[in-house]
Amino acid sequence: MDTVSRQLFEKAQAVIPGGVNSPVRACHNVDSQPLFIAEAHGCHLTDVDGRQYIDFVLSWGPMILGHDEPSVTRAVCDAAHRGTSYGAPCPDEVLLAEAVVAAMPSLEMVRMVNSGTEATMSALRLARAATRRDKVLKFVGCYHGHADPFLAAAGSGLATFSIPGTPGVPAAVVADTLLAPYNDLEAVKECFARHGESIAAIIVEPVAANMGLVLPKPGFLEGLRAICDQYESLLIFDEVITGFRAAFGGAQARFKVDPDLTTFGKIIGGGLPVGAFGGKRRYMELIAPRGGVYQAGTLSGNPLAMAAGLATLGILRKADYDGLENRTRAFAYSMRDIIAAKGVPLQMPTLASMFCPYFSEHEVTDFADAQKCDQKLFTSFYKQMRAQGIYLAPSGYETGMVSFAHTDEDFNRALDAARKVMF
């Protein structure tokens, strides 16, 4: 059927590579075409054809308050009237930095950037400078943006030197990137036994939300902290997704493990482009202009994103996170039971306001497990839910999101749609 979305997608492909500005939006993984969105309010999207959807993607995480939250929208409009970019410091960037530092247990200082990729790239540079070492250990399936050192694919063995994961990344760039399976502390110990004196940092999603939703096993994060302490390496938490979502104080507050450095994005910008990295003062003061580690950005700390982030955190500081988690869990488990009643095996892990439908008989504890899930079943589920006005992430490797704007009526409509799905 010809639609305005389809027409726009055809036009877009003539001037934008693949017709989208981020690959997952193309919906190739689910044998579909993208929806072009005209507007969004609360937890509802309206596409350019006038169809409405209940949104469980939430712009991949930032919109925890829902779309067009009045206080946030007003803050952005007020900021825009004062000027959209100064190329100089503004008051809100100080206030937002203070708010982030106050919320996160491990932070003493924070630097604003423009994206999660910039944040992780800068944090790695800082860790290498602080330790005077070059290697970094990451986990297979964890995503830390598209900077070259993180675009690595696993070689053979549990923990090994990596090979490039995409054309255009020289082998030399990822030669210092080591990989291990997520949740495998023994593999990390083995890697450090071989290379520990050369490893600047471990970088990890404390909750792996880019292979679906994989929770850390008990003791895993604590074990990483102990290993880093033993070898005098830095522990970097990538909290671009979990920051202000796993808890107001992020995953580090929830699991009571303090990293040396933390990266942020998504929620701290209230829906505008933003990133940040922060940590202990002794490391952060190595950054220029105080120290010699260079990092800069024309739009870093831009007034619109700072205003949106400040308004968002102001609301979240008083928000009922426990209530949102309980509602998310009840919704996700109800959906799991509905699908299971159809004779289809489904795992549905949840944490805070995140959930993920894995079509598998087995618990998913790492990326290898996630890859074994039935993607054909997921594709069928996605397409049938979308046809009924339920917008889920168009990939089995992405987490679902719930906002404070979702109501019982929204959950019930989604569950009714799940009941009508045929496998």
Curated annotation (Swiss-Prot):
Domain of life: Bacteria
EC number: 5.4.3.8
Biological source species: Desulfovibrio desulfuricans (strain ATCC 27774 / DSM 6949 / MB)
Required co-factors: pyridoxal 5'-phosphate
Residues modified as N6-(pyridoxal phosphate)lysine: K266
Pathway given in the UniProt record: Porphyrin-containing compound metabolism; protoporphyrin-IX biosynthesis; 5-aminolevulinate from L-glutamyl-tRNA(Glu): step 2/2
Entry-linked Gene3D superfamilies: Aspartate Aminotransferase, domain 1, Type I PLP-dependent aspartate aminotransferase-like (Major domain)
Protein name, per record: Glutamate-1-semialdehyde 2,1-aminomutase
InterPro entries named in the record: 4pyrrol_synth_GluAld_NH2Trfase, Aminotrans_3, Aminotrans_3_PPA_site, PyrdxlP-dep_Trfase, PyrdxlP-dep_Trfase_major, PyrdxlP-dep_Trfase_small
Alphabetical UniProt keywords: Cytoplasm, Isomerase, Porphyrin biosynthesis, Pyridoxal phosphate
Entry similarity comment: Belongs to the class-III pyridoxal-phosphate-dependent aminotransferase family. HemL subfamily.
GO molecular function terms listed in the Swiss-Prot or TrEMBL record: glutamate-1-semialdehyde 2,1-aminomutase activity; pyridoxal phosphate binding; transaminase activity
Localization in the cell: Cytoplasm
One GO term describing the cellular component: cytoplasm
